[in-house]
Amino acid sequence: MNYLPVSLNIDNRHVLVVGGGKAALEKLQLLSQFRCFVTVVGEELSDETLQYSSFSHIRPFQLEDLEGVFIVYACSSDRELNRLIKQEANARGILVNTPDDPELCDFLSPAFFSDGPMTVAVSSGGTDVRKAIAWRNRIKTYLSNDEGLIP
C-alpha cells in the first residue's frame, strides 16, 4: 500500500460509522474531537457508543446510509459487509477506512496529537498500529521536555 499523508477538513461534514464494537467506539471517540456530524449505524449500539454520535440508527446498514456522507469508517465485525460498504461508498466517491483491515482502506487514521494549530501524526501504513502509537507518545514526550515546545 502506498498512502499519501494528508489532513482532511471534516468541519461540518457528515461522517458515517458502521458497527457498534470496540473499533467503532474508538473511531467515535476520535471524531468527537472534531466539528463534524457523525452518524452511527449498527444492530447493537451501546449507550457509550450512542453518546459520541450526532445521529444513530440501531439497525443493519442500508445503502441509503451513504447519502451525503464525506467519509466512512466501516467497523463491522463482518468482513463481507465492510467489503460491500467499501465498494458502494467508492462507487459514490466516498473514502472508506476499515480498522484492522488495510486492504479495505482508502485512508488511514494516524496516531496523532495536537497543540494549538500544530499537529504531529505518525503512521505505519497500517502495518504496526502499536508502534505508531509508541512513536507518537515518544515524540510528544520529547517535545514536552526541556525544549519547551509544548507547554
Task: Give each language-model segment a name.
Residues 9, 113-151:
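Adenosine-phosphate binding glycine-rich loop
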Residues 39, 70-77, 118-127:
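Short beta-strand and adjoining strand-loop segment in the mid-core
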Residues 105-115:
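Glycine-rich, charge-decorated loop segments at or immediately adjacent to ligand/cofactor-binding or catalytic sites
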Residues 43-45, 61, 101-104, 125:
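Short, ordered loop/turn segments at secondary-structure junctions
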